[in-house]
Structures are given as structure tokens and as C-alpha cells.
Amino acid sequence: MNSDRGKGLSQNGEIMRVTFIAHSGFLVETASAYFLFDYFKGEIPELDQKKPLVVFVSHSHRDHYNPVVFDLFETYPWVHYVLDKDCGIKWKLRECADQGTDLAAKLTRVRKNQTYELTMPDGGTLQITTLRSTDAGVAYLLDYGGLRIYHAGDLSHWIWKDKPEDYNQRMAERYLREMEKLKGITVDVAFVPLDPRLLQDTPVGLEVFLEHVQAGKVFPMHVWEKFSVIQRFVKEHPCYRDIVVCLSGNG
């Protein structure tokens, strides 16, 4: 697994390259495909035209969904979009239809707690499993070519000090319920929120994830450019220092 932070191997020996773009936006490159998650700003690296690109959008919040991603199919020959059902797209479908492009053929709309299969150009199958977010939309669990990738979207342990105690209790229960669905699985790379706005509860979502999932590498996200929160997590959880990747800036 390559990134700006170093090099490692996935658990079946295949090398992946992970590029952090901004916020919750990441690009994962495998030997045979690209996967772009929750892009909303920043520079997308130039991609190999020979590889397929699958673009994932977990939900419609503006910090996870930028319709500019639909420009990518004009540049790259094989692009497929996987979007939560609540992401607005009718306007783009009409625009593309007026230009003679069938965007619907390049699109999969998803719902929570479902499994979808997408046939890739090499004949392989990309399996996409969705979890229910504790905020909006879905989280994604991908299986492809012996690799497993998890992107949480906004699925996290959202405990807010200005919310009633019973609200926060239900939130904690909902998050734990989703994590129980992942209990005992192995993932090669995961992208999980570590939001500093949660104050003393900031680390809880990532802690619970790591208690349930055996992960090769975990990239904290949704840190609102407060990258020191990642270093603090690793300092306070030294047992995870070889797993949690300490991002230090966008790009």
C-alpha cells in the first residue's frame, strides 16, 4: 500500500496506493482499478486511462458530494458512479440526455443494508455492501480482487454536548449496532471519521471500529484540517500506531 506516508502491503500481497485528497475524499488505486470516495474539493491526481474508475458518494452533504465528479466520465473512458439514493442527480441526468449521453447507464443508486455487484471491465466482480449511517446516507464495504476496503462516510459515534442525553444514548446504540455487523472481519484499508468537534468524545468512533475490525491500515478523516487530532489519537493509543496513518495535510 503506497501513500505519501509510506509503503506497505495489503494482506493478500497486492499493492495499493492511497491518496488523501481532502476531508473525507480519498483515491485508492489497485493493480486493476481506481476507487474515488466522497470527493468535494482538492486536486484529483491524473489517472491511468487504461484503468476503470468507480466513484463513490456516501451521502448528499456538501462536504461529501460535489457534482463536479460527473465531469470525470468526459476525461476517462470507463467511469461508474455509486451514489446514495438521496443524492440529487436528476438535473445531471437531464443535462447529459440533452447532450446524447446516457448517464444512467454509468450509475448505481444504493440504499442502506444492501449488497450490490458491479461487473468490471476485466470481468471481475466488485461487491459493494452498504451500512446504515448514523447521520446521513451509507457507509461502503468493498470486496474486489481479494482486497477489502471500508469507507465510513458519516457513519460514526456522533455524541454532541448540546444534544439531550437520550439522543446521545440512541446514537451510541445505533453506532454499536452497525459495528457489530463488521465484527471479526478483516479489511485491508479503512477510512473512518475522527472529528475534533466532538471534543472528549472525538476518539470513540475510531476506538469502537478498531475494537471490532482487524484493519491493515486506517486513515482517519473528517478532521476539518485539524490534523493534530490524529497524532494525539496515536499518542494516546500506541497499540494502533502501526495501523493508524498520521496524515499531516491535504493532498
Predicted regions span which residues?
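Core dinuclear metal-dependent hydrolase active-site scaffold
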Residues: 4-50, 105-186, 248-251
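Short active-site oxyanion
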Residues: 15-16, 34, 77-81, 216-218
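Structural motif
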Residues: 36-37, 56, 82, 149-152, ...
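Active-site metal-binding motif and surrounding structural segment of the metallo-beta-lactamase
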Residues: 41-88, 180-191
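A short, acidic, amphipathic alpha-helical segment used as a generic capping/interface helix at domain edges
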Residues: 174-180, 198-208
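Binuclear metal-ion centers of metallo-dependent hydrolases, dominated by the metallo-beta-lactamase
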Residues: 16-23, 100-122, 203-251
